[in-house]
Amino acid sequence: MFEKVLIPTDFSSHAKKVIECVGEIPGLCELLLLYVVARDPLARVWDPVAEVKEAEKRLMNEKNAIKTPGVNIRVKAVSVLDGEVASAIQKVAAEENASLVAMGARGKNLIQSVLLGSVSRNVLRFGDTHLLIMRYRMLESGDMEKYCARIFAKVLFPMDFSQPAEAALSFLKSMPGIGELVLLNVVSKGETRAEIDEGVKWAAEKLNEISQDLSKDGMKVTSRVVIGNPVEEIRFASDEEDVSLIAMSSQGSVAIKKGRIGSTAYDVANSADRPVLILRRSKIAMYYI
């Protein structure tokens, strides 16, 4: 599944924590640590070659500190103009044929916020590779350790019954290491109470069918149907269920025209308080039912 993982780092404590956690990713065979040297717009003199060499030395120190037996670890540093960091990450991910990009929600920026930093946000919006976003809010409160222990221990999967969501679920079904899967459908449309109730009934029946099918393969599955705003209800359910990860398709029943990510997936990834795995629609086409 995620045999080759790319981790962009800025050498912050948050980025180092992501590196420590990545060993729990199922099927990991190769790890590439990437540092992007961005030009300081205020600097009159810039020596990208020297900065890349210095970055490579620091990356080697990071590599030597990783204790993940059986995993091939490589390092890479590239230089770009300021503001092109996210593009550089995407380019390297494509060139290296990475199966997953794992990164923190924000880096060295000292402004405390639940929302994503600019680099993570741009990789989320414009990237084509599956993306795992680790949340730093948990690290600051000291609670991130439990998610590092087993990122896939309890996974919340929002299901809107769209083709991309079904493909993403099929992808998860074939992934080893998931302890428990929580299926969630949010009924957000209905002109009358009767329409809403009918939507809830239909969704509950569909989720029950899916749960029974997944349970046949030995997976522990629970499901729930709620009424409300999808983004708010997904965040609420993740807290109430105390999940270790939110996993969802990059696009659902309503997708941004010509975009790489739908509004619900974007808003959840941007504001969730725990790790979020975005499964790119373009990468899971083979799982379409």
Region annotations inferred by a language model:
Residues 1-50, 150-195, 212-216:
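Small/aliphatic-rich secondary-structure junction motif
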Residues 1-17, 73, 125-170, 270-289:
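Intrinsically disordered or low-complexity boundary/linker segments at protein termini
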Residues 32-34, 74-79, 132, 182-184, ...:
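General small-molecule cofactor/ligand-binding pocket signal
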Residues 35, 105, 136, 185, ...:
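Short secondary-structure boundary segments
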Residues 67-101, 140, 215-246, 254-255, ...:
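Structural beta-alpha unit
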Residues 94-146:
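Hydrophobic alpha-helical segments and helix pairs
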Residues 103-126, 248-271, 285-289:
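Glycine-rich, Arg-bearing micro-motifs that act as flexible, cationic patches
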Residues 179-244:
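Structured core of small recognition/catalytic domains
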